[in-house]
């Protein structure tokens, strides 16, 4: 019985399929509201990064769009130097995963593939805006996903529902 169960699990894993179909910029914006005056000030930046992900199933059920949104607001003193935003998206073919693996793939693995593209797009915008290069540190999407799961579980327990 155990051998049959483990063979079934191996077959399920063999049927799993993951493929990146396309990476694209969904939205991109840059604002320098205090230019050109901001260029004459001492450059002492403070950086605020907002990060968000979302995903949706596309027609056919095995294709998913994952969108990684990054918004960077940089201030020098109290003045906003610039705001740069990107929605970096990808289309992924994902088949044969259980619910837990699918959640992790869409919530952590796919965004980690998109992040280098989003980071490069933001850096390019900032440099073209005549500001120093923006070097965003790598993001551990596995940790962010685990934190989100823990938050959702805590909210479920607080409201009396089981997830």
From Swiss-Prot:
Keywords: Chaperone, Cytoplasm, Protein transport, Translocation, Transport. SUPFAM superfamilies: SecB-like (SSF54611). The keyword Nucleotide-binding does not apply. Gene3D superfamilies: SecB-like. InterPro entries: SecB, SecB-like_sf. GO terms for molecular function: unfolded protein binding. Pfam families: SecB. Coiled coil: none annotated. Homotetramer, a dimer of dimers. One homotetramer interacts with 1 SecA dimer. Belongs to the SecB family. One of the proteins required for the normal export of preproteins out of the cell cytoplasm. It is a molecular chaperone that binds to a subset of precursor proteins, maintaining them in a translocation-competent state. It also specifically binds to its receptor SecA. This is Protein-export protein SecB. The gene is secB.
